């Protein structure tokens, strides 16, 4: 075969998948029908969970240098700031990156693309997928090359990361269920001064919709995203000057617009693929789900799709696991996409409804509710975990098993394991647990008890074992995360808990690996 995996689409999702496969020794062929990486972008927000993954890829530091950290989000109504979500304060103990990083899709693609080239894989641009045929063993893909010729390549698996107009999805006959919104958005890169909170996200609510101001690199540089007023929706020759007056009025506060370097209008859809897999074909990112920009979730969700699938594909390609492991991709990620679509659709509908009652609620009631909610610790934590995507869980997955005896308040199977700062040797300095984990392998954490002296038979290089001894510093940190002692956690390569229990039993780990992960273990 020409490749183990054909990755169609070299946007953030495809590049993330290709990087993760390359790290695990999987041969990926990456194609994209466009001439090169995107130069302009609507996607901006990089969430905490994505930054945690970037750290494992080795690109988080350049991302932080390129981006702008937004440690809070502010709600404005009629020129008054009515509520604030303090992301940095809420998430300080939940993630190494308790903020929203404002970094354009183009910059994300450049970082991921450079990392992929450093791993020896180049994107084949101007190469279009025009045909697919699969049998029990492989795919045959017909590709249209830059000179117009058609060629054929073979691969064991195909990943459709080719966006909302996905050729992979269409050629596989998978329905894309949903509809477009009637509203027309605009986006503008502007130089502006005013009363907005610097270095934070500013949300302006008005009777017919909302405007968002994202802080960008450079003095007084902002990205403005908004909804066109009804009377401008059918105009095709709009310039930013055409919307300035309405923006000033709708924001309800003094704004001094100095320069606009880019302006564009667009419509958005809310759609989800009927399924994320067709035998040897998978859908990821915008090819699988698209939704409103509420919450800056779209690009991040695609990146997590890729992170979820990559380790599973690598195990199957290497022969380390049976193909049944791949069933868990759709079972885990489709509910996430549907839940996100439902949540963002409801929020978006509330924010843009033309109904006078909805407008009244938006400008008079919502702000008061938000202000009260942000005074409650439980709501603040829920908001951070939801927005940052650190709260995504797979409790119903076939890969999730919590053994009897583990108290209900402790992290459970399917959860992202908490970020902790721990000592792994007596009297040693505390370490960032996430930096110690090996995300190309499974990680077994033995807490307040010794790990098996001879490891776990049959898992070998697939497993890294970490002992967390009981001492005053560790006890405080574990108690904060509600992790009991003794306990143990088997973490999947993507950082989610696969198996959790109290007293570590190597036989239980072996059984889990064989029966749930479908790993080929000698003697089982």
Tell where the protein language model's regions lie, with residue ranges.
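Glycine-rich FAD pyrophosphate-binding loop
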Residues: 22-43
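Conserved FAD-binding catalytic core of PHBH/FMO-like flavoproteins
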Residues: 114, 157, 161-268
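FAD/FMN-dependent oxidoreductases across multiple families
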Residues: 66, 237-301, 321, 326, ...
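A conserved short coil-to-beta-strand element within the FAD-binding core of flavoproteins
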Residues: 125-139
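Helical substrate-recognition/capping region of FAD-dependent monooxygenase/halogenase enzymes
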Residues: 1-4, 8, 24, 33, ...
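Core beta-strand elements of the Rossmann-like FAD/NAD(P) dinucleotide-binding domain
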Residues: 3, 147-157
């Amino acid at each position: 075969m020409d490749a183990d995996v054909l990755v169609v689409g070299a946007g953030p999702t495809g590049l993330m998948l290709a990087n993760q496969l390359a790290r695990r020794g999987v041969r990926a062929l990456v194609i994209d029908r466009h001439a090169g990486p995107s130069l302009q972008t609507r996607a901006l927000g990089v969430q905490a969970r994505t930054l945690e993954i970037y750290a494992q890829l080795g690109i988080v530091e350049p991302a932080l240098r390129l981006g702008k950290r937004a440690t809070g989000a502010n709600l404005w109504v009629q020129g008054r700031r009515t509520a604030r979500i303090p992301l940095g304060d809420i998430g300080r103990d939940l993630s190494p990156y308790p903020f929203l990083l404002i970094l354009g899709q183009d910059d994300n693609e450049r970082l991921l693309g450079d990392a992929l080239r450093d791993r020896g894989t180049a994107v084949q641009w101007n190469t279009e997928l025009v045909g697919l045929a699969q049998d029990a063993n492989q795919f045959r893909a017909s590709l249209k090359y830059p000179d117009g010729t058609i060629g054929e390549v073979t691969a064991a698996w195909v990943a459709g990361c080719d966006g909302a107009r996905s050729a992979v999805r269409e050629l596989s006959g998978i329905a894309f269920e949903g509809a477009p919104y009637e509203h027309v958005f605009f986006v503008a890169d502007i130089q502006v001064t005013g009363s907005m909170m610097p270095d934070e996200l500013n949300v302006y609510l008005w009777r017919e919709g909302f405007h968002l101001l994202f802080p960008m690199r450079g003095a007084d540089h902002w990205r403005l995203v908004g909804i066109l007023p009804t009377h401008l929706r059918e105009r095709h020759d709009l310039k930013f000057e055409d919307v300035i007056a309405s923006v000033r009025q709708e924001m309800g506060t003094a704004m001094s617009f100095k320069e606009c370097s880019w302006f564009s209008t667009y419509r958005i859809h809310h759609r989800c693929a009927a399924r994320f897999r067709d035998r040897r074909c998978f859908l990821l990112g915008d090819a699988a789900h698209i939704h409103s920009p509420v919450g800056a979730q779209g690009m991040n969700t695609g990146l997590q799709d890729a992170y979820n699938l990559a380790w599973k594909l690598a195990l199957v390609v290497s022969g380390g696991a049976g193909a049944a492991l791949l069933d868990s991709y759709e079972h885990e990620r489709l509910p996430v996409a549907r839940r996100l679509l439902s949540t963002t659709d409801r929020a978006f509908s509330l924010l843009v409804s033309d109904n006078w009652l909805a407008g009244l609620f938006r400008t008079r009631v919502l702000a008061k509710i938000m202000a009260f909610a942000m005074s409650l610790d439980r709501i603040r934590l829920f908001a951070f975990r939801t927005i940052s995507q650190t709260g995504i869980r797979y409790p119903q997955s076939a890969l999730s098993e919590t053994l009897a005896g583990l108290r209900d308040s402790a992290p459970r199977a399917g959860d992202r394991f908490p970020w902790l700062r721990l000592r792994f040797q007596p009297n040693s300095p505390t370490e960032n647990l996430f930096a110690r984990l090996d995300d190309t392998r499974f990680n077994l954490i033995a807490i307040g008890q010794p790990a098996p002296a001879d490891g776990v038979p049959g898992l070998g290089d697939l497993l890294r074992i970490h002992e967390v001894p009981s001492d005053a510093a560790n006890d405080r940190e574990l108690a904060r995360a509600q992790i009991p002692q003794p306990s143990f956690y088997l973490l999947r390569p993507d950082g989610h808990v696969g198996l959790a229990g109290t007293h570590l039993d190597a036989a239980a780990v072996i059984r889990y690996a064989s029966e749930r992960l479908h790993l080929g273990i000698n003697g089982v």
